């Protein structure tokens, strides 16, 4: 079964559809953007981000759409693209400072933080502050052994680095 974000009647929600085709099933119905759906390695949960609480935050739900649970609660950051590790113990995410973007925006060319937390939402830590944003960790890039993950950062002259470099 595939999970994806789709726009229907001006609302963005998470849907699933059988891989062989068929009828799609709407899993979320909260107002605003629900995006970034990703199954955990055993297909029990779908991780996603949602603006339903006022800021973009990480959420988790059962694969059938039940038990939708907010996993991050940061009042100063918009949290995007939660990626669960293959061993289902850790989650990485990219965070935009409140005020740098609107809650539903995930734009490039911003200073962001990459964070990691335990899969139960505890022990949130900033791993690195970098210049990036859209494209930094849009897809799950954990190593199969759950010990490393890849991300993208870049520099633009005049933004984040001096013009003369």
What kind of feature is each model-predicted range?
Residues 1-165:
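Sequence signature of WD/YWTD-type beta-propeller architectures
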């Amino acid at each position: 079964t595939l999970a994806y974000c789709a726009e229907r009647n001006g609302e963005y929600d998470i849907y699933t559809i059988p891989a062989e085709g068929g009828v799609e099933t709407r899993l979320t119905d909260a107002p605003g953007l629900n995006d970034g759906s990703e199954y955990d390695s055993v297909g029990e949960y779908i991780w996603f981000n949602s603006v339903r609480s006022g800021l973009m935050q990480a959420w988790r739900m059962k694969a059938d759409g039940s038990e939708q649970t907010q996993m991050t609660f940061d009042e100063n950051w918009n949290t995007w693209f939660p990626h669960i590790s293959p061993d289902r113990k850790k989650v990485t995410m990219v965070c935009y400072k409140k005020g740098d973007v609107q809650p539903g925006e995930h734009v490039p060319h911003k200073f962001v933080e990459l964070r990691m937390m335990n899969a139960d939402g505890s022990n949130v830590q900033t791993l690195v502050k970098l210049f990036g944003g859209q494209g930094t960790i849009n897809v799950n890039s954990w190593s199969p052994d759950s010990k490393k993950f890849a991300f993208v950062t870049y520099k633009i002259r005049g933004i984040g680095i001096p013009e003369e470099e």
